[in-house]
């Protein structure tokens, strides 16, 4: 009789890599042109003045200035860059 148990295969043990989403530059901080402000899935935050939106809904600064978060009608959150 064999003294070893049969080695069962496991179906678990794998996970996807984290995508590092979220706010990268917070309110009242200075952003350079082209710097990423938010990485997101969908448009949780919408681009305001001087902010561009990438094809994966990443928001980035178009000019150098201070990041400003604001909520407008319908609970929409907008991010703008205020230039000095």
Curated annotation (Swiss-Prot):
Coiled coil: none
Gene Ontology terms, MF aspect: structural constituent of ribosome
Protein name as annotated: Large ribosomal subunit protein bL27
Cleaved signal peptide residues: none
GO biological process, one term: translation
Protein's gene: rpmA
Pfam families in UniProt: Ribosomal_L27
GO annotations of cellular component type: cytosolic large ribosomal subunit
Region (Disordered): 1-21
Keywords associated with the record: Ribonucleoprotein, Ribosomal protein
Family: Belongs to the bacterial ribosomal protein bL27 family.
PROSITE patterns cross-referenced by the UniProt entry: RIBOSOMAL_L27
């Amino acid at each position: 009789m064999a003294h070893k148990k049969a080695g069962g295969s496991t179906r678990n043990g794998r996970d996807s890599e984290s995508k590092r989403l979220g706010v990268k530059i917070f309110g009242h901080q200075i952003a350079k042109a082209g710097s990423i402000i938010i990485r997101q899935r969908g448009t949780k935050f919408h681009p305001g003045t001087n902010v561009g939106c990438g094809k994966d809904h990443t928001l980035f600064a178009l000019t150098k200035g201070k990041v400003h978060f604001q909520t407008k009608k319908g609970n929409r959150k907008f991010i703008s860059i205020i230039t000095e």
